[in-house]
């Protein structure tokens, strides 16, 4: 089909496709960043029976800054819900000697959380497994609040909905120097999981622009 089109038409069509994809990618990324930042405004529910802190990669047994913000958020919320348990979820990744859950538990204990209040889920290797494995440790009727980073809420909540988990989500603020990498990475993860939405939007805009041309 393209062989029968003039070179100018093919060039115009290629430019239109590139411009449309570029516009959608930029616009959706901005929306994603705005939504992610707005999740920080969400407060902890009045009744909480359990907190679930989603893990992140640890190095040399130390809690990295992004994960520390999640744990600090959970600690602050727990102070007003001290009857609640805290589940820390994360397995052994990247040839680490300890699971993310063990490192997270040690951090919580060092910051005043009683060891008896902490439950370790030490097998999960990704967000989907974090939620799936943790759900096996929680009774269906319990009120659960998931604590994760602002950039991570949208994808984690989408997974929870797919699993039928009616949990609340609160987020911690990502340190500025980690924002570019973490926000773009999770945005690309959302496109990967919902590629049909992105492709559909692209085709729709192309059709509109083609008609209006």
What are these regions (language model features)?
Residues 176-195:
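Membrane-interface, cytosolic juxtamembrane amphipathic helix immediately N-terminal to a transmembrane helix
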Residues 189-213:
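C-terminal single-pass membrane-anchor helix
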Residues 17-25, 29, 194, 198, ...:
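Alpha-helical transmembrane spans of integral membrane proteins, capturing the lipid-embedded, hydrophobic core
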Residues 11-15, 19, 27, 31-182:
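A structural signal for short, hydrophobic/glycine-enriched beta-strand patches
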Residues 2-9, 211-213:
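Juxtamembrane "helix-exit" motif on the non-cytosolic side of transmembrane helices
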């Amino acid at each position: 089909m393209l062989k029968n089109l003039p070179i100018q038409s093919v060039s115009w069509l290629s430019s239109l496709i590139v411009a449309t994809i570029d516009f959608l990618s930029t616009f959706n990324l901005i929306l994603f960043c705005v939504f992610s930042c707005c999740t920080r405004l969400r407060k902890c529910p009045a009744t909480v029976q359990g907190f679930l802190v989603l893990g992140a990669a640890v190095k040399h047994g130390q809690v990295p800054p992004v994960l520390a913000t999640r744990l600090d958020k959970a600690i602050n919320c727990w102070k007003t819900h001290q009857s609640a348990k805290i589940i820390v979820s994360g397995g052994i990744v990247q040839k680490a000697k300890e699971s993310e859950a063990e490192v997270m538990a040690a951090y919580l204990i060092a910051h005043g959380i009683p060891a008896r209040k902490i439950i370790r889920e030490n097998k999960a290797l990704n967000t989907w497994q974090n939620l799936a494995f943790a759900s096996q440790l929680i009774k269906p009727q319990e009120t659960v609040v998931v604590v994760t980073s602002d950039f991570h809420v949208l994808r984690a909540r989408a997974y929870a909905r797919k699993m039928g988990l009616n949990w609340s989500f609160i987020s911690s603020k990502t340190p500025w120097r980690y924002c570019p990498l973490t926000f773009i990475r999770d945005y690309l993860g959302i496109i990967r999981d919902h590629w049909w939405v992105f492709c559909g939007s692209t085709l729709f805009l192309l059709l509109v622009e083609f008609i209006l041309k």
